[in-house]
Regions:
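Acidic/His- and Gly-rich active-site-bordering loop/insert found
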Residues: 1-29, 50-55
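A common structural junction motif
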Residues: 4, 147-154, 191-192, 263-268, ...
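Glycine/charged-rich beta-loop-alpha catalytic/anionic-binding loops adjacent to active sites
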Residues: 17-30, 158-168, 335-336
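Short helix-loop-beta-strand segments that form the rim/entrance of peptidase-like active sites
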Residues: 48-67
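Midchain, well-structured core segments that form catalytic/ion-binding scaffolds
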Residues: 68, 74-249
């Protein structure tokens, strides 16, 4: 698991790094992603040792510190230490995740925008849906079209400041949040109908998260639909820069995704840089997946099956690894959001599940 966290924004009911307990919940950034689950794993390992369990293999806990970026930590670790034969990452969902979509973090130059737009800014991390977008526009701009949009308007030093708000969430699940940039681009495009760059972003990138409006609704049976999410927006020398989080189906190649995107974009559109994490697909009939499902189903008295996600964990960096928890089916999604928390009851429950999972993994002879 990992100890690094995504940035915090305003609006928390408790200090985001205070670990305050309210109504049986520990509030703070990282409580679910991923410090809380790693604490559960630590106590699970300690309890297993104290029980007198005699493993056939070595149990190792790996703590990373760059998972939210490019996983440079685990890449370095792999050059220094022999990788485990099998592993879990407590950084996803229960019951067990055996499929993770490919991740393509893109840095885009979309093109020139009107001189009437002096600045536009949103977000700080590619993999977080921004909950605030601001823009500075020239005072001469006709703002009457803004009446149709949910935009705050303020005067600042002889210029007009526009603000749009949304709901932050994980970039792998953009449909669970509200991207503040969408309303901003639609509003600016309405005020500047002849601006091709703004029109492209508003009409193609801010209509849905599955590539339908953009022209590449990629999908497969194994992992589902592609998703794309605007994470960071800036204006440099009049050019609109966007950091885009793309999660693509496992049966597609990243090169195909890039070409499909460029084919359906305006001429000025460029992918300046891209950070790619290849998809993961571990056989559902593997001893690891079957063993973990057995542990989870016994604890929860159910018959759950492995699932696919758009999120990315250390699992794709290790030879035989899958994400196992910590989020339980039906629980409120709080990862990367304001007021992230972990229920103490759930923390105790996941610790018990991890204890049983460690025992199961350590007893496996055939991998």
């Amino acid at each position: 698991g990992h100890l690094d966290v995504v940035p915090v924004t305003e609006g928390w009911i408790a200090p985001p790094f205070g670990g305050e307990i309210i109504d049986g919940k520990i509030y703070g950034r990282g409580t679910m992603d991923d410090k809380g689950p790693m604490i559960a794993c630590l106590y699970a390992a300690k309890a297993l040792k104290m029980s007198g369990f005699r493993p056939r293999r070595t149990l190792r806990l790996i703590f990373g510190c760059d998972e939210e970026n490019n996983m440079a930590c685990i890449k370095y670790y792999k050059t220094k230490v022999k990788m485990p034969d099998l592993a879990i990452s407590p950084d996803g969902d229960f019951p067990v995740i055996n499929v993770e979509k490919g991740i393509y973090a893109m840095e885009l130059d979309v093109g020139k925008v009107s001189d009437a737009v002096l600045d536009i800014s949103a977000g700080s991390r590619t993999n977080v849906v921004p909950d605030l977008c601001t823009a500075l526009v020239d005072k001469s701009l006709d703002l009457k079209p803004l009446e149709k949009f949910n935009v705050e308007v303020k005067e600042a030093d002889g210029r007009i400041q526009l603000l749009t708000r949304g709901k932050s969430t994980h970039g792998a699940m953009p449909h669970t949040g509200v991207n503040a940039t969408w309303e901003m681009f639609r509003a600016l495009s309405a005020c500047l109908p002849d601006d091709k760059t703004l029109a492209f972003v508003a009409e193609k990138m801010c209509r849905d998260v599955n590539g339908k409006a953009w022209g590449f609704p990629l999908e497969d049976e194994v992992s589902g639909k592609i998703t794309h999410s605007i994470g960071v927006v800036s204006l440099k020398n009049g050019n609109l820069k966007i950091k885009l989080d793309v999660r693509y189906p496992v049966t597609y190649k990243d090169s195909f995704v890039a070409e499909a995107m460029k084919k359906n974009s305006i001429g000025s559109f460029k992918i300046e840089e891209g950070h790619i994490k290849q998809p993961l697909h571990v056989d559902a009939d593997s001893p690891l997946v079957k063993g973990l499902l057995e542990v989870y189903n016994k604890e929860m008295s159910c018959d759950a099956k492995p699932i696919a996600i758009g999120g990315g964990t250390y699992s794709r960096m290790l030879p035989m690894c899958v994400a196992f928890g910590p989020s339980f089916p039906g629980d409120t999604q709080v990862i990367h959001e304001i007021n992230e928390y972990v229920s103490i009851d759930r923390l105790m429950q996941m610790a018990h599940i991890y204890l049983e999972a460690f025992a199961k993994m350590l007893s496996l002879i055939h991998i």
